[in-house]
Amino acid sequence: MNSVRRLNSILTLVLSGLWHLGLTATNYNCDEPLASFLSPLAFFSSSDLNGRFSPPQLNWRIGSGGWSPAVSNAHQWLQIDLGNRVEITAVATQGRYGSTDWVTSYRLMFSDTGHNWQQYKQKDSIWTFVGNTNADGVVYHKLLHSMRARFVRFVPLEWNSNGKIGMRVEVYGCSYKSDIVGFDGQSTLLYRFNQKTMSTLKDVISLKFKSMQGDGVLFHGEGQRGDHITLELQKGRLALYLNIDGSKARLSIIAPLAILGSLLDDQHWHSVLLERVGKQANFTVDRNTQHFQIKGETDALDIDYELSFGGIPVPSKPGTFLKKNFHGCIENVYYNGVNIIDLAKRRKHQIYSGNVTFSCSEPEIVPITFVNSRSSYLLLPGIPQIHGLSVSFHFRTWNEDGLLLSTELSEGSGTLLLILDGGSLRLLIKKVARHGTEIITGSSLNDGLWHSVSINARRNRVTLTLDNDAASPALDTSQLQIYSGNSYYFGGCPDNLTDSQCLNPIKAFQGCMRLIFIDNQPKDLISVQQGSMGNFSDLHIDLCSIKDRCLPNYCEHGGHCAQNWTTFYCNCSDTGYTGATCHDSVYEQSCEVYRHKGHTAGFFYVDSDGSGPLGPLQVYCNITEDKIWMTVQHNNTELTWVQISNAEKAYAMTFNYGGSMEQLEALIDGSEHCEQEVTYYCRRSHLLKTPDGAPFTWWIGRSNKRHNYWEGSVPRVQQCRCVHKENCLDIRSFCNCDADIGEWAKETGFLSFKDHLPVTQIITTDTNRSKSEAAWKIGPLRCYGDRHFWNAVSFTTEASYLYFPTFHAEFSADISFFFKTTALSGVFLENLGIKDFLRLEMSSPSEITFTIDVGNGPVELLIQSPYPLNDNQWHYIRAERNLKETSLQVDNLPQSMREASEEAYFRLHLTSQLFVGGTSSRQKGFLGCMRSLHLNGQNTDLIERAKLMSGVTPGCLGHCSSYGSNCLNGGKCVEKQSGYSCDCTNSPNEGPFCQKEISALFNSGTSVTYLFQEPYLVIKNTSLLSSPIYADTAPSKETIMLNFLTTQAPTILLYLNFSSQNFLAILLSRNGSLQICFRLSKIESHVYTMNTENLANGRVHQVKINKDGPELSIQMDQQLFTYNFSPKVEFWTLKSLVLGKVTETLGLDPEVAKVNILGFVGCLSSVQYNHIAPLKAALRHSGIAPVTVQGTLTESGCDSTLDSDVNAVTTVHSSLDPIGKRDEREPLTDTVQSDSAVIGGIIALVTFVTFCVIGIMIHFLYLHKQSHCTNQTKEKEYSENLSNSFRNAIDLQNTASECKREYFI
């Protein structure tokens, strides 16, 4: 591909040079003054001061000393007739001698005929020239593009505010000689070959043309075997048909190979160049070039007998043509170096002409342009009170809506309106007292083409004819008497018109009109311009200034362009891009960026070059690991058996990754590491055989290069992995497969040399022997790391900078990067041109400025931040400029944006190097860090450039100050040279940001016990827990967190076993309320019951308990409960933590013991006590952590656990019966009913006796306890509605030493 591109570039340069050399107008000394010696009659103007005319040549001092119009306004102009078509390369101006009259800005127009003027354009826009600042100074302008014309017109735009318009002018250039032939739409010019067939491997065809119509054949040639070449004008665009494949398809049914140009029927000159070498071709119309490849079996174009210009004559039928002929003029036709028109003028035998002229005669058609949608109009008089009406004209526009014609009819006939409505013509005749007439015809008439309209009203019949289609006009036969009026308003209505002379129910027309006829009489629009007929406002007379803003198409990445008269719009649907010109990718550039924005694992589209030309590619991002793996699948990752193959008939498999090789290369080059797993199985099938001989099996990688090394080997060394491990099956071989044994062997490992990846093809040639077999498996492409997201440098002095090649951003420029600094100001980057420039800087601690000049004055965007930007935190900047708008974005602050003016579609021309972190003057440089610099989506390697410069160091620390908050759930931010990472050691979660919950399913017998003894290692290195719990410590601050999901109530969630038989248990009561039960002293126990919904509802709930001194807070989901301890109550030394069922029941509180029989059935996640994560230790570090697991513990996400999953876990029910009727919020189990009536009766009897005994004991203990409890400190009194729920619980084992209390909150 690269070689082809280089060939095309060289070819284009060479052929373009030959083409320009062939033009007879070429003159390297084309700068002679052309107006100095002209007769005064060669100058003409819109008006003259006091009716006196003074020759306006440069340095003229006689008479009035130059030209001034009678009135200084925007409608004045000065015109020069240069006698013949000349080439104009420069202009100069002065003010009027001895006066205060001079022009400060002006425009140029040129023409061949003195009519149908063309405005001079530069940078694809109507150019405004800078004029004078005094009367005597000469301001000279060299034209970027020369003009070829006979007439030149200077149009003043602005002038000295203390004087009037005054000009003396000069035009520089040289004579222009050309060969012209004119076609009248019925003629052709034939160039016949000296031999029967002209067979060419390369062709160069160039010409210029001026067309009077939108359709016609410029030239055509064909061969008998089917080759042909045709250039045809179709609806104002040039279509090229070129075929070398020998097919004999008819020209009328095949599609053109290329279509270029637009509005080419404007009666102006347009250039065409076709260059072909074999199947490669360049097609250029004016300055727009399209490269394409021709289909075909050969490289030669075979044309028989002749080339025809102007039409396609039918053989043996004189005067008959296959398609519509060309009507217009063609200039300087060169076919492979042969001047065709020169041969015709000299009447050489190769030329056969039919009714052609060697001059360019064109009708004097005067177009007009309506430029303003609010105030443009043209008033023309008519002959009133004629019975009937006749109006016709041509129009062209891009707007869907606009008033074309409004006239008040005589004799009370009403008002006639012709409107362009939604691209259709709508004729209305409105009457006050009766129903009027409405005719609608046509569609999509806002296509920019010329359309003819004719309105005729005669004998109660109204006819609307569109595009001369007299066979099917739109009719209305209403009984209406129509009498013509005396005023016809075209395009709009005057602002000061208050009566019904002109009605406009829609906005004014913007577009061009010509050939206006009223009552079958043509209207002289030059007379209107001179003020001798009619009136007008905001018109350009004698030119049509329509512009195709969609050519070239500035909508990038396949965006669809639509336009109106003043601007264009881009439809970016289904492109993967957004923005005014579809420039900005909607996708991120790597999985690392997706991770940084909080996304989890899944399929994503990655756009490696952002706004660059490469499209997005679908990948899988595994964002659950510390290394963010990006996986690109291909079309065959399964184990595949090799068919019979040998050296003559090799087996080959090609891999398709769903994207282009350029996309894959960009993805790989932007990654830190890439690999593909390769496994090759073999039995009596060689792989390499020898390290220096031809291999039997190889693979194709990047750039279509062949590779002979395999997994684990060094690139370009023909070996396999077993050589380095010294375990090959045959020590004489370099691969296991080369042992050539009858048993299966394999080679497996990873290919990881990025410059060779991905694997695009595998070829095998040794499976044709007896019992010879082979199979392979090529894994997907996997990469991790983003080389550019953390690519950072530090600028240490104001004079330091990095320089890069010139930023080429003529039509679109986007710049993005991160920065952090403590400086007050500094320039981030700067790029200069001759006049153009762009600069991005921090102008103050809270202001970012983006300044850009594309030749029409600087545009400055400013964002003021409400917070300081020099806070040594990372901040993001993105600046963009395109043909529609300029914008600046800082962090998430509101964007600053400015739309481009209607004519400000200028190219940005930069010539200097791009300075990053400073300026060319080495002043006002940036001090601080910058990273991830992207220019038009392209990654810029700051680190590599910094290695070559002083005052700039690679890398930048301090990422955690900005991104430390991304480490969630207790994770710790760890600085790295390129970015940061989250240490999840002290977090119950895991993952890149410690956001992935570690969760597991429990059944009724599952128990996870964490013993608090000595500190333990949680990873394979020597890192210890940052806050380990020692056996003899008693922290004053405690935190317990867990998430749970269950459908079982009552149940036990967590149990903390302290010394001296103290405990804390988290339970669910019978009705699903949360209960916290604990005993933290020898004298009392506490039970807190939260009045919440039933938490055993199969949904995930979160519990967080904090104890800070005497204050206890319990957060249940979004509800917060608080309680104050007695200051003397403290947590004692913790011995163990149990999740699920408590297996060591000795000394277990009786109430807790009853619930413990059931265990826990459900899911627990994110369990944490202070810095200890017991569930994480059980699942991830069971071999080294002091944790034991009994029963079945199944790792599973709680969010993905269904009710059926929870219910499916085995549940054990208690056989104990509660003592008496208890509150449902108490943590007691339900009685299990027996199916046997006998057993039920026995149990009932035993229960009755037991109740009697317990009743006597309760009475005795109550009296004893009351005397003891009166000495205890009184707790907080609760309201009366809770007093009934408050009661003392009884500890059957420690009745003499405990006062147990329960609270409902």
UniProtKB/Swiss-Prot annotation:
It is found in: Membrane. It is a single-pass type I membrane protein. Disulfide bonds join 30-174, 329-360, 512-544, 550-561, 555-570, 572-582, 929-956, 960-973, 967-982, 984-994, 1163-1198. Residues 30-174 form the F5/8 type C domain. Gene3D superfamilies: 2.60.120.1000, 2.60.120.200, Galactose-binding domain-like (2.60.120.260), Laminin (2.10.25.10). Residues 584-790 form the Fibrinogen C-terminal domain. SMART domains: EGF (SM00181), FA58C (SM00231), LamG (SM00282). Keywords: Cell adhesion, Disulfide bond, EGF-like domain, Glycoprotein, Membrane, Repeat, Signal, Transmembrane, Transmembrane helix. Its main location: membrane. It holds the Pfam family Laminin_G_2. Residues 1259-1305 are cytoplasmic. InterPro entries: ConA-like_dom_sf, EGF-like_dom, FA58C, Fibrinogen-like_C, Fibrinogen_a/b/g_C_dom, Galactose-bd-like_sf, Laminin_G, Neurexin-related_CASP. Residues 1-24 form the signal peptide. Residues 25-1237 are extracellular. Residues 546-583, 957-995 form the EGF-like domain. One of its GO terms (biological process) is cell adhesion. One of its GO terms (cellular component) is cell junction. CDD domains: EGF_CA, FA58C, LamG. Glycans are attached at residues 282, 496, 571, 622, 1057. Residues 180-360, 367-544, 791-956, 1014-1198 form the Laminin G-like domain. May play a role in the correct development and proper functioning of the peripheral and central nervous system and be involved in cell adhesion and intercellular communication. Belongs to the neurexin family. This is Contactin-associated protein like 5-4.
